[in-house]
Amino acid sequence: AQRNLQQTVDLLMDVDRLLASHPLYRLEEWVELARNSGTTLQEKDAYEANAKRLITSWGGIQEDYAARFWSGLIKDYYIPRIQLYFTKDRNKIREWEEQWITSPWSNSTTPFDDPVEAALSLIEKTNK
């Protein structure tokens, strides 16, 4: 199970980097748009938290109702949440999600230099 979890995480990290190659598939754009709507630091933080909540925990019992498959969101939200689900106390997931939503986010994903080559390599790797 641990090996399968690591393979899944590795694949998702590659997908995160691949999606970073296009601005429409980046959490960074969503967060910047939200923050730029505020005029004070408090407003900017609140708008960022609301924007992140919309694409993560919003929807109540309909888990991941408004989910997005964006670079940054995969690496910094979905992967840690998956790891928490499989390796730690599942009861702490909601608490962790709320902490992620209310904490300022910054991009730490570096896109591939050649996304086409990376995509082909990723296809080859997953077909093994």
Question: Where on the chain are the PLM-derived regions?
Answer:
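Catalytic domains of carbohydrate-active enzymes that cleave complex glycans
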Residues: A1-K128
